[in-house]
Regions:
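Secretory-pathway/luminal and periplasmic proteins that interact with or process carbohydrate-rich
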Residues: 15, 32-42, 151, 168-174
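Acidic helix/loop microenvironments that form the catalytic cleft of cell-wall polysaccharide enzymes
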Residues: 30-33, 109, 154-172
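Short "domain-exit" segments at the C-terminal end of structured domains
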Residues: 178-190
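Second-shell loop/turn segments in exported
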Residues: 12-16, 25, 94, 124-134, ...
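Active-site-adjacent structural elements in enzyme catalytic domains
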Residues: 20-35
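Peptidoglycan-targeting cell-wall enzymes and recognition modules
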Residues: 31-143
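N-terminal export signals and maturation junctions of secreted/periplasmic proteins
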Residues: 4-10, 14
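Short, small-residue-biased leader/transition segments that mark boundaries at the very start
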Residues: 1-6, 178-181
């Protein structure tokens, strides 16, 4: 379904994702962020040990164990790690969960949702729903790509800076996949 949306529409050309290097970088980043194009909503279903490794700034092991024991653990984790940043309110506001990652690039935070909604002339609530459709997931990724000027990093092969702008917390896990995809696709004829 994503191939249809991305390649049989004007979406990629409209956002100037139109060279082998740009397409390679875009597809590799989206594939990683969406679990191989399978998930349109961020998965925060962590074990305590993983939670401390990925979000160690917010969780020591006892705190991670307490959060992971909650019946609504994904919501609780999102509210903690996304509190007071990206335009979100504090942990009790529920904004972390409300504005957790959605779409192919996992658009995250009240600020990003608000700007994306404004670019389409829709409400934040409508944008949240749209992000979970094939079209919205793809369009939000393209919008984020353009808004953050990521084509320049694809053009120069600066995968590290590009990745930091998308989600710097997972650089080690991404680097091999991204470099491999970038090399393979950028060798394709234009």
């Amino acid at each position: 379904e994503f191939r249809r949306v991305l390649f049989r529409s004007q979406l990629l050309p409209d956002y100037e994702i139109n060279t082998p290097a740009r397409i390679a970088a875009f597809m590799a980043q989206c594939a990683h962020e969406s679990g191989g194009f399978l998930f349109l909503k961020e998965n925060l279903n962590y074990r305590p040990e993983s939670l401390t490794k990925i979000f160690g700034k917010y969780f020591d092991l006892p705190t991670a164990q307490a959060y992971c024991a909650r019946p609504n653990k994904q919501e609780a984790i999102a509210n903690r790690v996304y509190a007071n940043r990206m335009g979100n309110g504090d942990e009790a506001s529920g904004d972390g969960w409300r504005f957790a990652g959605k779409g192919l690039i996992q658009l995250t935070g009240r600020t990003n949702y608000t700007w994306f909604a404004a670019s389409l002339g829709i409400t934040v609530e409508e944008a949240s729903e749209y992000l979970q459709t094939f079209e919205g997931a793809a369009q939000s990724a393209c919008w984020f790509w353009e808004t953050n000027n990521l084509n320049q990093y694809a053009d120069s092969g600066d995968i590290l800076t590009m990745t930091k702008k998308i989600n710097g917390g997972t650089i080690d896990r991404k680097s091999t996949r991204l470099n491999s995809s970038h090399t393979d696709i950028s060798r394709m004829p234009s």
